[in-house]
Regions:
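Strongly charged
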Residues: 1-5, 9, 16-21, 27-85
């Protein structure tokens, strides 16, 4: 699954274009490396996501097939680290 679509489906970005913008700006990394928004993500991948106010590192546990409700999104990833900036 493309990283921009994954971020949208897991409610980690409001829109797919916002997710793509975050990836392009370097705010989203996979395994510590900068990627393109077309990067295919698989289970077990480690994502580093930087927001203006916080940074989180997550491991993808399962790939969603469609948009996930906010209350259920954390069953698809595991938070490794989270810190406020």
């Amino acid at each position: 699954m493309r990283i921009d679509l994954l971020l949208k489906y897991l409610c980690l970005a409001k829109t797919r274009s916002e997710a793509a913008k975050g990836v392009r700006s370097g705010g989203v990394r996979v395994e510590g490396k900068a990627v393109k928004s077309s990067k295919e993500i698989k289970t077990g991948d480690i994502l580093h996501i930087r927001y203006p106010e916080r940074e989180i590192v997550i491991e993808i546990v399962e790939l969603p097939r469609k948009q996930v409700p906010r209350k259920k999104r954390e069953q698809f990833y595991r938070i490794i680290r989270e810190r406020n900036l």
